Design a protein with these regions (language model features):
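Membrane-proximal helix-turn-helix segments that form the acceptor-binding/catalytic region
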Residues: 95-104, 138-161
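N-terminal strand-loop element at the rim of the active site
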Residues: 6-13, 26, 30-85, 180-181
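A short, histidine- and acid-enriched strand-loop-helix "catalytic/donor-clamping" loop
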Residues: 116-120, 128-145
Length: 248
């Protein structure tokens, strides 16, 4: 039985992490599956993971970006500097531990789930190992981000995109490389037994309620739309740092 390794930043709450767990649960039916995880944020994956999937934690460190920014905001310079140095050491450990895993694993297939992993996998992955990048984000006209993805994945065998439009976009960008782009949509854990009739005038958004997700922008946009279409409602489902702000 062939072995698949999936490189993961952590197994906490997040869309990428949910997709990683769903993929691992599917692949373990036919492969040995190991998730190589940089950070151990919780005692176990927050999403239900098949017992056949092995999780290997590469470090004992945890990210400290939040603490660093909090001290900066409060102008506690010494503590911010201390957290900054701690963060730099953490980035060094993260890079070295991930590269060591890539070079030493006996896996036949390695799947990267972040652009930083894409680059390291392309540079340090062993000959004969199938190297796959899995891009979850849309570049949203940010060509710096898109070009970074192209640079990071140019030495991989495949780049998996979650939409047809992204597949077409990156296929053109990677045309002069050996990296082939393929479209594979995200996995559904379970197919719903009952389908929506789609007759209600409701807008529904589900996700982590954090600043980068743009829920305040969504709410502002809905306030404009609702003036012209007052019978439509907006349901925001989720939890996170901006929940209280959204509720108020």
């Amino acid at each position: 039985m062939k072995k698949v390794s999936i490189l993961s930043l952590h197994l906490g709450y997040g869309g990428i992490e949910k997709s990683i767990v769903a993929l691992a649960n599917l692949l373990c039916e036919s492969y040995k599956v190991e998730i190589a995880c940089v950070y151990k944020l919780y005692d176990k994956s927050v999403f239900k993971l098949d017992r056949r999937v092995k999780v290997k934690y590469l470090t004992k460190i945890k990210p400290n970006k939040k603490e660093f920014h909090e001290y900066l905001k409060k102008k506690k310079i010494f503590k911010a500097l201390k957290e900054g140095l701690k963060g730099l050491k953490g980035l060094y450990i993260r890079k070295n531990s991930t590269i060591n895993y890539i070079e030493s694993t006996d896996s036949d297939i390695i799947i990267s789930t972040r652009d930083i992993f894409d680059e390291w996998l392309g540079k340090f992955g062993n000959d004969g190992v199938l190297k796959i990048g899995w891009e979850h984000n849309h570049y949203h006209d940010d060509m710096r981000y898109a070009n970074e993805i192209v640079r990071a994945t140019s030495k991989l065998d495949y780049l998996v995109l979650v939409s047809e439009s992204l597949k077409e976009f990156y296929s053109k960008k990677l045309a002069n490389t050996n990296c082939k782009c393929v479209y594979i949509p995200n996995i559904l854990d379970n197919m719903p037994k009952k389908m929506s009739s789609l007759t209600e005038k409701r807008l529904v958004s589900v996700g982590r309620l954090s600043k980068e997700k743009g829920y305040m922008d969504l709410l502002a946009l809905y306030n404009i739309i609702s003036k012209e279409y007052p019978t439509w409602s907006l349901d925001i489902i989720g939890d996170g740092a901006e929940r209280e702000k959204l509720e108020n």
